[in-house]
């Protein structure tokens, strides 16, 4: 979100001001701008595994006389929402949802009612968001709805292993889909990694629009793979990465480019589960022997068949010596 000229101006102005105030000659400046020089050589590419979208009230959903009063109140808000009352409607919807969540936590409403509340609340949020886009002056509370409505794209990587600066110092990296570029991305999303950590997400992006907390993405197409690229990661991300949740080094491909095109120089396999377990003093060979002993005794005791034992051992070895990420 700044140019090289901006960067130079800010850096040099400090020296100029200090030199002028001290009435001394301007110095020769020698700098090593690490990220600027080295970041460009590396790109992180990962697959989107799954997505979640907030629920919505569908046409087939009906309100029954037996439904909870909070559901009926929220349904009336949704039916009557309009541009002139959108802020009031949003406040009322938030209040009803909060009351419903409190009652749910005390066991006073059931799971079905909770689901109805969620569907109606997020349907109201979408309506208010659409209406607000047609107004000149949007209240800050309404602006926040856009961020709340983003999908979550769960991706096959570890933020702490591959993009530690995004977590540690809020570094913003350029991120975008690397295919389907002839299609307009109609969804917006935040990125979630594979770790169990709530910090394992990216919700701050480079953006020329007023939506830096979400990224434009495409909807997934059935079982077709969908990949995102994170650029300018060559400045020490791989070196700084750690083994949070025991996700290891990723697969790497060295590519050289010349006037005639590109060629793949080297393919380096990422770490296996056995390798990362070794870091925390687990002996993979001993683990396999232990499982082999259990399988042998189970076959002899008639607990499992010989074929089941062979299949179990094959799957165990395959997992243990396989990639730490999903394959």
What do these predicted regions represent?
Residues 18-24:
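Short helix-capping segments at alpha-helix termini
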Residues 4-18:
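Alpha-helix-loop-beta-strand connector modules within alpha/beta enzyme cores
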Residues 1-5, 52-54:
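Glycine-rich tight-turn/loop motif centered on a GG-T
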């Amino acid at each position: 979100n700044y140019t090289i000229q901006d960067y130079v101006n800010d850096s040099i102005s400090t020296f100029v001001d200090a030199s002028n105030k001290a009435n001394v000659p301007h110095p020769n400046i020698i700098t090593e701008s690490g990220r600027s020089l080295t970041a460009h050589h590396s790109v992180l590419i990962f697959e989107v595994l799954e997505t979640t979208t907030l629920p919505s009230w569908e046409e087939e959903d009906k309100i029954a006389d037996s439904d909870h009063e909070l559901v009926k109140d929220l349904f009336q808000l949704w039916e009557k929402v309009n541009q002139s009352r959108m802020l009031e409607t949003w406040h009322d919807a938030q209040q009803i949802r909060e009351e419903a969540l409190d009652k749910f936590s005390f066991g006073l409403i059931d799971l079905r009612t909770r689901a109805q509340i969620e569907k109606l609340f997020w349907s109201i949020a979408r309506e208010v968001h659409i209406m607000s886009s047609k107004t000149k002056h949007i209240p800050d509370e309404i602006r926040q709805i856009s961020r709340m409505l983003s999908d979550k794209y769960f991706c096959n990587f570890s933020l702490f292993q591959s993009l530690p600066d995004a977590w540690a110092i809020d570094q913003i990296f350029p991120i975008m889909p690397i295919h389907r570029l002839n299609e307009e991305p109609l969804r917006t999303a935040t990125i979630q990694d594979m770790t169990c950590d709530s910090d394992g997400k990216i919700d701050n992006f480079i953006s020329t629009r007023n939506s830096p907390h979400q990224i434009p993405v495409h909807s997934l197409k059935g079982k077709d793979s969908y990949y995102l690229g994170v650029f300018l990661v060559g400045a020490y991300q791989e070196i700084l990465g750690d083994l949070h949740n025991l996700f290891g080094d990723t697969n790497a491909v060295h590519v050289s480019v010349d006037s005639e095109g590109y060629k793949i120089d080297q393919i380096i396999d990422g770490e296996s589960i056995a390798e990362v377990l070794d870091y925390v003093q687990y002996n993979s060979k001993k683990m396999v022997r232990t499982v082999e002993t259990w399988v042998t005794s189970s076959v002899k005791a008639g607990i499992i068949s010989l074929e089941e034992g062979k299949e179990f051992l094959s799957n165990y070895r395959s997992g243990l010596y396989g990639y730490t990420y999903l394959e």
